[in-house]
Amino acid sequence: MMNMKIVLFSLLLFVIRWNIISCNKNDKNQGVDMNVLNNYENLFKFVKCEYCNEHTYVKGKKAPSDPQCADIKEECKELLKEKQYTDSVTYLMDGFKSANNSANNGKKNNAEEMKNLVNFLQSHKKLIKALKKNIESIQNKKHLIYKNKSYNPLLLSCVKKMNMLKENVDYIQKNQNLFKELMNQKATYSFVNTKKKIISLKSQGHKKETSQNQNENNDNQKYQEVNDEDDVNDEEDTNDDEDTNDEEDTNDDEDTNDDEDTNDEEDTNDEEDHENNNATAYELGIVPVNDVLNVNMKNMITGNNFMDVVKNTLAQSGGLGSNDLINFLNQGKEIGENLLNITKMNLGDKNNLESFPLDELNMLKDNLINYEFILDNLKTSVLNKLKDLLLRLLYKAYVSYKKRKAQEKGLPEPTVTNEEYVEELKKGILDMGIKLLFSKVKSLLKKLKNKIFPKKKEDNQAVDTKSMEEPKVKAQPALRGVEPTEDSNIMNSINNVMDEIDFFEKELIENNNTPNVVPPTQSKKKNKNETVSGMDENFDNHPENYFKEEYYYDENDDMEVKVKKIGVTLKKFEPLKNGNVSETIKLIHLGNKDKKHIEAINNDIQIIKQELQAIYNELMNYTNGNKNIQQIFQQNILENDVLNQETEEEMEKQVEAITKQIEAEVDALAPKNKEEEEKEKEKEKEKEEKEKEEKEKEEKEEEEKEKEKEKEEKEKEEKEKEEEQEEEEEEEIVPENLTTEESK
């Protein structure tokens, strides 16, 4: 009977365990990954990785000119080894669906489609470069080729590449609508209808690569496989490096997962830019990326520059680079016509190479140079569009995060404006700045600890020779009356500071609203009523969300071993209401051995601790500061309203008084104005009379003149008449004389 109970009990446990596992699997397939939602700020760090990777790093080539981007690239390479981050981005890009579910449905997201377009354009560009080099080699060996056209392998490979390029150009011309859709898409657009076209687009680019280079084909065709392999390998290698990358990003899953693919495909063009001009200004959407990268710690924590980028990107609409796409298609037509004229021959018969027009290669090369330039412009437009899509996805991820949190707490879904969401995003950047600072301080303390207490080779060898099963002996506290050594004091102080950093970091990640939580190094002190300042004052509303942590571990263990081996106990508690920040850890000075060195270390640790506490207070008081600002702003508005009313009343009174004065002055001036008007009228009348008299005089004078003229004319007429009469009389006298003479 006892055995039967044991069997039934074990069977029951097996069934329960199987149900739990199947439930977890169903939850994963259905959708939301809590790690993604609770760590939405991880998206920011991919942005910085993608830009530095694209613009300042080329694999196996010249080192980047920007030292910040060089460090960022190294951090990003380590980041990609951790699969949870790349999976998180994959879930977000797929609308919070699991990777397996999205693979089964065969759906692709916008960023992946843009990535395929970039890959295709890059393969197209590589083919153009290879053809240009082939043409140059033919021109250099022109005399030899003229002698042996039929069996020249260089000429034959050139013709093959031209045919491949012609097929590429024809393919682009046939799929113009697909390119335009990709360029004009929005962040919420779905590509289910264009799935087959996208796959053919990607495979078309890789087919052209196979004819050109076998190795490049293998890299490009296995794009997704290589991504998965790179993400799976070395998952446990990035503990501190992951935190140092917690700044800004959204895309390494699409743009930096495959080093062999993206480094060669997206960054080859940028190497030439850096060789020509190291001071190139790159842009994040519309805002220069230097404004995001070249900032100090304080600006990075406030996150204003990056949020300006997000605001500007969210305000944008429509596609990018439409003119570049039109120029690309038009130039492609000309290239296709030139290639068609040159490659009319049948390549199956090598004797046809005799008719190969070598003289037309110069024109083809010039056209290829122009075509390549337009292709580069189009590629940069596509990359800018990809960046905008990623920033929009970041915004979408945060909206989903807020909705999920509201559902968990049983609250209605938030419906607020974009500006309020952007303010919340700033808080996420503050969290990331704190986490980044924590990681930097931890690495600094580790280096300091290793320099002060270097491990000897003999100790390491002795540890290796010991059996793994030998249990560790926990370090016991100092006995009464026994003073600890100086080295152990320094070691314990550094370990305590690192423990507090881990504590604050965990509180920020897991429970951002936790108030009055005492760090583990301070929880065992006598003064248990002390609280941590800078926490949220509204903790009474949800006391069930807050936990106190008690650590039990071996001092010689690392933090991971401490948590995994011994464990962490979480207990609910009522928040403490009174008290201030506890004093920071102080080093105990014992003996006379190198006191200056110990004091210097103590000062460094105290300064670091003060900076941490100040920034932590700035973070936690951010919302309170906003509330105070809003209250002051409202008070100013009320005061301004009161002042405006008073000033309006005073102005009305002054206006009335002025109008009365004006009316009185007008009335006083009225009679004077009448007299002046009458005088002016009299003067005008006198002037008119004088003018009339003058006119009459002139008229009389004119009449007299006319009369005189008439008299003169009459006199002239009379004189003329008299003269005529005299002449007539003379004529009568002359014939009489003549008659008298004749008679004689």
Swiss-Prot record:
Keywords (A to Z) from UniProt: Cell membrane, Coiled coil, Membrane, Repeat, Secreted, Signal
Reported function: During the asexual blood stage, involved in the sialic acid-independent (SAID) merozoite invasion of host erythrocytes by binding to host SLC4A1/Band 3 protein on the surface of the host erythrocyte.
Biased segments, Basic and acidic residues type: 459-473, 672-698, 706-719
A GO term from the CC aspect: extracellular region
Protein name: Merozoite surface protein 9
Chain intervals for the UniProt region annotation (Disordered): 202-282, 459-487, 512-540, 666-744
Compositional bias annotation for Low complexity: 512-521
Stretches forming Sequence repeats: 226-231, 232-237, 238-243, 244-249, 250-255, 256-261, 262-267, 268-273
Post-translational changes noted in the entry: Not glycosylated.
Origin superkingdom: Eukaryota
Compositional bias ranges of the Polar residues kind: 211-224
